[in-house]
């Protein structure tokens, strides 16, 4: 008989299992061991986290975006601006230099809770706009996700898409969807988030690789 302590475990594993760690499985009633490397992970692999707890001018991810994954996602949660009626924006980095030229091309649509239509676009932007007119009242913030498509590729322009929800200046709820590209085929190696005016006061930003 197998000692139950072998199954229940004597010591907790405090970190992710190594590829050579093993599990016991029942294969048609026969116990077999299985390497952790053969067990598929989740679709999203957390690579980095930045928690903003006081005012900063920007949040940068300058490592972790490379050819390891085809696509990357950045989630932002409870992002609160210092200034009223501003937008969260994003720039990309090429060869460790954040681009501030007018090669950001995008369009977005959305709705506000008063049935107002949101529409914005730019063919000569200096950054991607990710949401709509955030309020800075104590209960107002924005959350959403940005997808970078094949940032390490060098054949096509650098595509992105984003969706966000938030509370506008004036207390209206809103939802926006935006997509576009940076007009260069060079590999992207970083991203920067910043407000159209003023600081980011609070928020959590997470970078994921997408399997």
Regions found by a protein language model. Give the residues of each.
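Surface-exposed molecular-recognition determinants
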Residues: 3-11, 19-31, 35-211
């Amino acid at each position: 008989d197998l000692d139950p302590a072998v199954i229940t475990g004597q010591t907790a594993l405090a970190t992710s299992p190594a590829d050579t760690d093993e599990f016991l499985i029942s294969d048609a009633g026969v116990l077999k061991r299985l390497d952790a490397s053969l067990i598929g992970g989740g679709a999203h692999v957390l690579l980095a986290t930045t928690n903003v707890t006081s005012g900063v001018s920007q949040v940068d991810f300058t490592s972790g975006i490379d050819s390891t994954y085809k696509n990357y996602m950045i989630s932002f949660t409870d992002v609160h601006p210092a200034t009223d009626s501003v937008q969260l924006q994003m720039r990309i980095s090429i060869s460790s230099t954040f681009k501030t030229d007018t090669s950001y091309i995008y369009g977005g649509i959305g709705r506000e809770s008063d049935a107002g239509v949101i529409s914005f676009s730019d063919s000569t932007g200096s950054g991607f706009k990710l949401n709509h007119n955030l309020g800075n009242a104590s209960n107002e913030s924005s959350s959403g996700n940005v997808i970078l498509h094949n940032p390490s590729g060098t054949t096509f322009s650098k595509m992105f898409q984003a969706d966000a929800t938030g509370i506008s200046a004036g207390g209206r709820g809103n939802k926006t969807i935006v997509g576009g590209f940076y007009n260069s085929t060079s590999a992207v190696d970083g991203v920067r988030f910043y407000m159209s005016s003023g600081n980011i006061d609070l928020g959590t930003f997470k970078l994921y690789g997408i399997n």
